[in-house]
C-alpha cells in the first residue's frame, strides 16, 4: 500500500473495484500548487466501494469528490467528515454513518442525486452549510438526537423530502436550510425546544416573532400570523403559495424571502393608519426578494423605500406594472432583469441605475428617465427589444457602452447631456438627436 503522502499515517491501494484505506488519525492531503487543488492520490482511479482499516478519525476534504461510489460504510472511528468529501458522487445510493461521527462539513454530500435515505449517527452535532444540497432523491432524513446546528442551505433542493423533525437539542438553524424542498409538507419541532417552534408545519422561532421556513409543498393562500415581526431569509423560497397576506406587525422582510415562488400571484401587506406597510430594514427592498416569481403581475412598493436591491424582481416574467416611489435613490444590479414590465418611470430622486437593471425586459416599450440620474451602468437596458425611443436627461454624465446593446427596436435617442459622446452607445441605425446642436 502507498501512503497518502510521504510520512502520512494512512496508506491506500485499489483491488477489485475497492479502495482500501488503512491507518490511523485524520485523513489529510497536501495541496498541489501547480494544479491549484488538493493532491488526492486516488482522484483519477476507478472504484465503487471503500474499505477502512485501522483507526481513521476523519474523512478529508474532497476525499471522494465526483467518484463512482455506490455505497459506503463510515467506520465508528470517524468523528468528522470534511467539506466536499462526497460532493457530486452521483451514483451513491447508501451511506451508513458511524456511531462516533460528530460533524459533517459543508457540501459534504451535495448533489448525491441517488441518495434516498439518511440516518445520522447518534453523536452528530453539526450538519453544515449545503451539506445535502441537491440530493433530489432523498425521501427520508432521520436526525441525530444530539443535533444542535443545521447550516444554511443544508437541504436546499431536496425535492423529494416530505417532512423533517428537529429535536429540542437544535439551537441553531441558519437561514432557511429547507428552501427549494418542493415536496416538503411539514417541519416538526419538539415541544420542549427553547429556541424554535412549529405551527401547521411552518418553522418559527420560539415566540413566533420570526418566520423561518414555509415548507416548499405549501399551496394556496398563506396568512402570516400577527405575532410575526420578521420574515427571514429565504422563508418562502420555492414554495407553492399563490397568495400571501402580511400583517402590519411585520417590520422586516429579508433577502430572497419569496424567491422562486412560481405560483405566487399576490402579496398583500396590511397597514395600520399610522404606518404605511412594511418598513423594510434600512429602507431597502432586499436582494432577490421576488426573484423568479413568474406569476406575479403587479407590485406596489412602500412610500419610504430608498433602495431596490440586486435581482429583487429578476425573472418576474408576468410582472406588467410597477410604480417606483419618489423616495427611491438606487436601483441596483439585475433589479428587474427579465421581467415583463411594459413601461417604467424612474423616480425623481434616483441617482444610480445599476448593471443589468432592466436587461432582457423584452416587453419594455417606454422608459422615462429622471432628471438627476447620473450613471446608466453596464447592460442596464441590454436586450430590451421593444424599446422604441429613449430620452437621456442632462444630468447623466456616464453611459456604459453596452447599456443599450441589443435594443433592436430602438429608433430614436435624444441625448440632452453635453458630457456624453454618443459614439457607439446606441445600436446602428438609431437616430441620435442632441438638442443643443439643432
Which residues does each predicted region cover?
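Intrinsically disordered, low-complexity segments enriched in polar/charged residues with Gly/Pro
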Residues: 1, 189-191, 379
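Short Gly/aromatic-enriched secondary-structure transition segments
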Residues: 29-43
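Short, mixed-charge aromatic SLiMs
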Residues: 424
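The feature captures the LRR N-terminal capping module
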Residues: 1-19
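Consensus positions within tandem repeat domains that build extended binding/scaffold surfaces
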Residues: 60-63, 82-85, 105-108, 128-131, ...
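Conserved, function-critical positions that sit in or immediately flank catalytic
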Residues: 427
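Structural signature of tandem-repeat unit edges
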Residues: 15-26, 45-58, 67-80, 90-103, ...
Amino acid at each position: 500500500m502507498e501512503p497518502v503522502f510521504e510520512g502520512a499515517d494512512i496508506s491506500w491501494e485499489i483491488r477489485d473495484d475497492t479502495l482500501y484505506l488503512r491507518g490511523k488519525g485524520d485523513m489529510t492531503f497536501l495541496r498541489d500548487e501547480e494544479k491549484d487543488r488538493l493532491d488526492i492520490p486516488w482522484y483519477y482511479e476507478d472504484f465503487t466501494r471503500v474499505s477502512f482499516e485501522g483507526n481513521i478519525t476523519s474523512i478529508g476534504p474532497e476525499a471522494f469528490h465526483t467518484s463512482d461510489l455506490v455505497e459506503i460504510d463510515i467506520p465508528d472511528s470517524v468523528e468528522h467528515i470534511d467539506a466536499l468529501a462526497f460532493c457530486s458522487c452521483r451514483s451513491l445510493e447508501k451511506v451508513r454513518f458511524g456511531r462516533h461521527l460528530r460533524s459533517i462539513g459543508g457540501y459534504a454530500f451535495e448533489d448525491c442525486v441517488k441518495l434516498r435515505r439518511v440516518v445520522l449517527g447518534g453523536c452528530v452535532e453539526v450538519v453544515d452549510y449545503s451539506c445535502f444540497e441537491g440530493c433530489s432523491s432523498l425521501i427520508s432524513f432521520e436526525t441525530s438526537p444530539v443535533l444542535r446546528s443545521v447550516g444554511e442551505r443544508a437541504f436546499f433542493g431536496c425535492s423529494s423530502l416530505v417532512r423533517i423533525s428537529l429535536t429540542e437539542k437544535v439551537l441553531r438553524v441558519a437561514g432557511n436550510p429547507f428552501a427549494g424542498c418542493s415536496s416538503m409538507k411539514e417541519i416538526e419541532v419538539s415541544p420542549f425546544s427553547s429556541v424554535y417552534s412549529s405551527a401547521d408545519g411552518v418553522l418559527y422561532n420560539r415566540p413566533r416573532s420570526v418566520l423561518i421556513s414555509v415548507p416548499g409543498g405549501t399551496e394556496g393562500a398563506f396568512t402570516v400570523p400577527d405575532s410575526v415581526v420578521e420574515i427571514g431569509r429565504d422563508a418562502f423560497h420555492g414554495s407553492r403559495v399563490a397568495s400571501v397576506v402580511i400583517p402590519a406587525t411585520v417590520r422586516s422582510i429579508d433577502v430572497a424571502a419569496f424567491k422562486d415562488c412560481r405560483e405566487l400571484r399576490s402579496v398583500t401587506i396590511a397597514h395600520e393608519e399610522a404606518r404605511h406597510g412594511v418598513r423594510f430594514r434600512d429602507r431597502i427592498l432586499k436582494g432577490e426578494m421576488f426573484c423568479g416569481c413568474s406569476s406575479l403581475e403587479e407590485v406596489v412598493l412602500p412610500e419610504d423605500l430608498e433602495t431596490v436591491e440586486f435581482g429583487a424582481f429578476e425573472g418576474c416574467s408576468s410582472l406588467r406594472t410597477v410604480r417606483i416611489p419618489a423616495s427611491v435613490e438606487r436601483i441596483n444590479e439585475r433589479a428587474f432583469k427579465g421581467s415583463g414590465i411594459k413601461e417604467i418611470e424612474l423616480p425623481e430622486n434616483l441617482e444610480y441605475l445599476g448593471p443589468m437593471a432592466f436587461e432582457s425586459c423584452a416587453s419594455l416599450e417606454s422608459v422615462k428617465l429622471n432628471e438627476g440620474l447620473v450613471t446608466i451602468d453596464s447592460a442596464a437596458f441590454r436586450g430590451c427589444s421593444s424599446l422604441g425611443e429613449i430620452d437621456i436627461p442632462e444630468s447623466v454624465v456616464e453611459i456604459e457602452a453596452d447599456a443599450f446593446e441589443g435594443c433592436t427596436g430602438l429608433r430614436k435617442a435624444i441625448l440632452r447631456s453635453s458630457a456624453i459622446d454618443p459614439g457607439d452607445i446606441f445600436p446602428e441605425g438609431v437616430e441620435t438627436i442632441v438638442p443643443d446642436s439643432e
